[in-house]
């Protein structure tokens, strides 16, 4: 009965489609700062699954396809025009989530690896100078108040972020004979999200389809049962009539 095999076929099709949707490419920055200065070198690396026949990578900058097919996209000398959202895709990977890169033209820049952190995340901030010019007497400030001082330029590290670490940050230091300050950067700390609280869309769809297929199977089962019972009721065993032959005299 082909209609009994239909739910199984649908289940296999849905399962393969959902499995394919689980793979998504990932864009990583090297170095991992999301804010850089002009003339900095930035490498964007696409992590995904390739096919034996096609090892090319599709890169997108602000939704426009880039004529570059290597897994690593190198920006040798960044310019402000290179700012924007970057995404990548491979043969066996879905389009990645966007990664924002900001390129600034300035003497001093406060760098960060993220703009939004969760409670408990480590935070790294760096007071970066144009062309890596030496910077001395570096002060990191939060909401206008000094947070950390370094005689020689060093990163500001916070091992576990709390809501108290939210706020407006900037850094200042001595370059040559000039006291220079960076532009301010807003750092936000959110509550940690629980992965088990919300299912991804493909898992929700899969669960709904499983329930639908179960309902179809149940309806078909009882429908077949009723059909069989009706067939048995209609069919009646023929009655045999025996007659006694007259005996020969």
Curated annotation (Swiss-Prot):
Which molecular-function annotations from GO does this UniProt entry contain? IgE binding; IgE receptor activity; IgG binding; IgG receptor activity; immune receptor activity; low-affinity IgG receptor activity
The main location class comes to membrane
UniProt's post-translational modification comment states: N-glycosylated.
Q: Biological process (GO) annotations?
A: antibody-dependent cellular cytotoxicity; calcium-mediated signaling; cell surface receptor signaling pathway; cellular response to lipopolysaccharide; dendritic cell antigen processing and presentation; Fc receptor-mediated immune complex endocytosis; Fc-gamma receptor signaling pathway; macrophage activation
Give the site residues for Important for receptor turnover. 217
State the signal peptide span: 1-20
**In this record, what's one Pfam family?**
Ig_2
Cysteine pairings via disulfide bonds = 46-88, 127-171
The UniProt entry, under InterPro entries, shows: Ig-like_dom, Ig-like_dom_sf, Ig-like_fold, Ig_Fc_receptor, Ig_sub, Ig_sub2
Q: Is Transmembrane included in the keywords of this UniProt record?
A: yes
GO CC field: cell surface; external side of plasma membrane; extracellular space; Fc-gamma receptor III complex; plasma membrane
Task: List locations, semicolon-separated.
Answer: Cell membrane
Q: Which residues are glycosylated?
A: 55, 62, 179
- Ig-like C2-type domain spans which residues? 31-103, 117-188
Superkingdom to which the source organism belongs: Eukaryota
Question: Is Glycoprotein among this UniProt entry's keywords?
Answer: yes
Q: Which UniProt keywords apply?
A: Cell membrane, Disulfide bond, Glycoprotein, IgE-binding protein, IgG-binding protein, Immunity, Immunoglobulin domain, Membrane, Phosphoprotein, Receptor, Signal, Transmembrane, Transmembrane helix
According to the UniProt entry, which residues carry Phosphotyrosine?
235
Topology in the lipid bilayer: Single-pass type I membrane protein
Which stretches are Extracellular in the membrane topology?
A: 21-203
Where do the TM regions start and end? 204-224
Residue ranges that the UniProt entry lists as topological domain Cytoplasmic: 225-249
- Return the PANTHER family for the record: IMMUNOGLOBULIN FC RECEPTOR, LOW AFFINITY IMMUNOGLOBULIN GAMMA FC REGION RECEPTOR III-A-RELATED
Task performed by this protein: Receptor for the invariable Fc fragment of immunoglobulin gamma (IgG). Binds with intermediate affinity to both IgG2a and IgG2b. Can bind to IgG2a and IgG2b monomers. Does not display binding to IgG1 or IgG3. Recognizes neutralizing virus-specific IgGs displayed on the cell surface of infected cells and triggers antibody-dependent cellular cytotoxicity (ADCC). Confers protection to lethal influenza virus infection.
Q: How does it assemble?
A: Forms a heterooligomeric complex with ITAM-containing signaling subunits FCER1G. Interacts (via transmembrane domain) with signaling subunits; this interaction is a prerequisite for receptor complex expression on the cell surface and intracellular signal transduction. Binds the Fc region of antigen-complexed IgG.
Q: What is this protein identified as?
A: Low affinity immunoglobulin gamma Fc region receptor III-A
Q: Which organism is it from?
A: Rattus norvegicus (Rat)
